[in-house]
Amino acid sequence: MARSGEAGERVVTIESFQSWLDAYGSAWETRDPQAAAGLFATDGSYQVSPFVEPMRGREAIHEYWIQIARTEQNVKFGYEVLAVTADFGIARWWASFVLIPPWSDTKLDGIFLISLDANGNCRSLREWWHKQQSWRKA
């Protein structure tokens, strides 16, 4: 598999991966679509489920995060790095938020497979997750 950096250069390190995950969590928790999209390479891809086509390009990812910011409140995000190679980082992640409407408390628990370029921007993000929801009474 070809690497994104110079020959033999380790593109994904534990430090670059954790830094990216911290910035991703901050963008989500603050509901900042510009910051979220800015974490991706201009031609980056983001696949939120193995059953849907990935979003391609920073603009498509930005549009997705605009919708997220409109429909989620009180977001909390955490992660645990599981593995890092020169090409990919793998992390377990979890998040909780209130989905609006219909005002449901939502928890997600999932896995990220992420590749970064030499500048620390995400070239591709694939995720798998499970959801637990409880509906608030009116």
What are these regions (language model features)?
Residues 30-45:
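Short, well-ordered alpha-helical segments enriched in acidic and aromatic residues
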Residues 16-27:
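Solvent-exposed, amphipathic alpha-helical segments
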Residues 8, 45-56, 68-70:
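A short gly/proline-enriched turn/hairpin at secondary-structure junctions
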Residues 27, 39, 68:
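Short alpha-helical functional segments enriched in proximate histidine and acidic residues
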Residues 2-11, 16, 32, 62-138:
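A beta-strand edge to alpha-helix "cap/lid" segment located at domain peripheries
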Residues 25, 50, 81-83:
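Structured beta->alpha junctions
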